[in-house]
């Protein structure tokens, strides 16, 4: 499929090193409680169909996605034991080709002087150099948080992507989804904490 994308001029490997990475992967992961509270598999399938649309926006287009698979065969053992039933952990894996837009200019050797230095063609070059947007961090009043040198504190780019995904899902009608705590290292919910959650509470990670 990668070679076909090259043949169809969807991507370009021009100037790419032999050992360069050709693929990236994103994992969309929501805790097991959220889907179990909504009935399980069918709800998770619909949720991740919408999440896939968010992935398309993030990578720049569906043409760069190689595969998107929802894993539905993993059991959250802690929750299953606590509730006395199988509670599955659903998540979505998206494998894609990372690209950056690159303009190729006419060289000084071009016979037509008027063309020299102008854009000859635009390619989508396979590259992991794309930098996701970082945004200034703000306090509860919406004011920028500053460092001691007066420069704004920037939120990590993956946190911005998490925000974008969260907002996408909310706009799509999943209004009971709650964004995970920023800068939290917690990934899984324990059986004890699960039993104290309200039905709509969830932790969402990109």
Regions found by a protein language model. Give the residues of each.
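N-terminal, leucine/charged-rich tether regions that mediate assembly and partner docking
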Residues: 1-144, 151, 156-158, 162, ...
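Intrinsically disordered, low-complexity sequence elements enriched in Ser/Thr/Gly/Pro
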Residues: 126, 177-180
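Secondary-structure junction/capping motif
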Residues: 127, 186-190, 202
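N-terminal membrane insertion elements
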Residues: 173-175
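Short, highly charged C-terminal tails/helix-capping segments
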Residues: 180-194
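Conserved small/polar residues in nucleotide/adenosyl-binding loops
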Residues: 195-202
